[in-house]
Amino acid sequence: MKVGVHKLAMSAPGDVSELAALIETGAVNPREIVALVGKTEGNGGANDFTRGLATLSYQLLLARHLGLSPEEVGQRIAFVWSGGTEGVLSPHATLFTRAPDDGPMPAEPRLALGIGITRDIAPEEVGTTAMVEAVAGAVHTALAEAGITEPADVHYVQVKGPLLTPATIADADRRGARLVTRDPNGSKPYARGAMALGVALGLGEVAAERITPDMIACDMEVFSAVASTSAGGELTKCEVLLFGNAPGATSAFRIGHGVLKDAIDVAGVKEALRSAGLSFHGTPSEEQAHEIVAVFAKAEAPVNGRLRGRRTTMLSDADIHYERHARAAVGAVIASVTGDPAIFVSGGTEHQCAPGAAPIAAIVRA
């Protein structure tokens, strides 16, 4: 397996010009595209329609090149968007290609990617053990597809799935189905948490008996160390992208991960880069930073609003949601190390690392 990685700048949620140019020059074979992970400039909430616009724009472009309908493109390629480019974060997409490769095997394991898609998640299943189990099954599928046999070789599992919307709440009401909440934005923690627990269950990080209906989005001491989950109203299924290093892969990249102990943890950023194989002293030089291909992180407000003993207003600000504060802060910290603000930073860390902490993964050139 040979995985390709291309970072695409976007001037607007509907801008697909950089991918169009790569296809035109032959740098990217559209038939090898398997996934796209990106940041759009919406609010990141239940009413963020920039994610759907971005997906449709890429689907329309690829439909022309693949001879498929936009809907068929969506079934063939996983699109994962996180809304919210606060602070220095730059709207962009990271494109992944995958193809068989009979070339010489590298001495070390290289980047591998597996994808798993769940069935449709009913509104009443959002944020429940049914969602957990569905994601765990998709994780098993993705592991097999990536050719990874040891969960320890997995460094990043990105999951995007549905949250509740007014329309899906109304659908559940018509059927008399019970929901975890009636608040669309309030359903995000439940959805993100259930998906993260699905990753933990699928990778064997957590035993099944520890996951019960009443602990989802409540008992944060149960978590995955490599899950990164996002929820949006544009999806009905959960899409699982599993990244790790596999012996049979011939990619030109490696992936590693670390933990951000809080929103200003520079050491955690460097930990992820070194885990991926980037060698540097202090902070990466400009030349070394060019070897960093992509960084993916989660962001969270400090527990009780206090950051290293100092009071913050992240949790008490009535004008700006704490997730937006956190994304802006974490994005700036990471960019100060990598020198590139085109970073995937997503808010909300329910069951994703220990309370107050957040996962971070990095892809570098091998």
UniProtKB/Swiss-Prot annotation:
GO molecular function, one term: hydrolase activity, acting on carbon-nitrogen (but not peptide) bonds, in cyclic amides
Region described as RU B: 110-247
Catalytic residues of the enzyme: 160, 230 (nucleophile)
Protein residues bound to substrate: 51, 82-83, 192, 230-231, 327, 346-347
Subunit structure: Homotetramer.
Family to which this protein belongs: Belongs to the cyclic amide hydrolase (CyAH) family.
Domain remark text: The monomer structure is formed from three repeating units (RUs) that share the same structure as one another. The monomer and the active site possess nearly threefold rotational symmetry, to the extent that the active site possesses three potential Ser-Lys catalytic dyads, but one of the 3 active site surfaces varies in composition suggesting it is involved in conferring substrate specificity.
Protein name: Cyclic amide hydrolase
Organism the protein comes from: Azorhizobium caulinodans (strain ATCC 43989 / DSM 5975 / JCM 20966 / LMG 6465 / NBRC 14845 / NCIMB 13405 / ORS 571)
